[in-house]
Amino acid sequence: RSVSRGLGDVYKRQDTEIAKIVFEDNKDERPCSLCAKLRKGAMYKRLGELGINKIAYAHNKDDFIETALMSLIYEGRFYAFPPVTYLPEAGVTVIRPMMYVPEKGVANFVINQGIKVVKNTCPVDGSTKREYAKQLMEQINRDNPGTKDRIMHAVVNGRFEDWPEVHRN
């Protein structure tokens, strides 16, 4: 909250029934996709109620790489979320300003600034497909140094229909 207030923004908390829906009603072993959709839906609805039309996600370089790897493994396609996305159904623009910052760089900044991190209370945290992709990518990068950078280069220079030309090297 202190960082948000320092930037002139207001921290807002929204109570939902998402955990109940995902873990009690649905009971899927891998509930991440449904949970993400419900969280985004609730967030976009709340942004609309507050008259907010732009949000910055904290996706970092490692998130982009892991998403590309997950796409290849689980969907058979090469994809990563675009740096800027306009969601017409929500009237919201999503920006990802930290896409070139490694996760360790973000973590170091958080520590150096004394920013308090909210612990993830999800019951499947640490055993998700994303966590698997993260560990796999770390192993691949240890065995083949520079792989992360090459994958990020491929992501940035890939030809994704929803990526503007300006974000390509």
Show which residues each predicted segment covers:
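Active-site adenylate/phosphate-handling loop in enzymes that bind or generate adenylated species
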Residues: 33-105, 151, 168
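A conserved beta-strand->alpha-helix junction
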Residues: 9-26
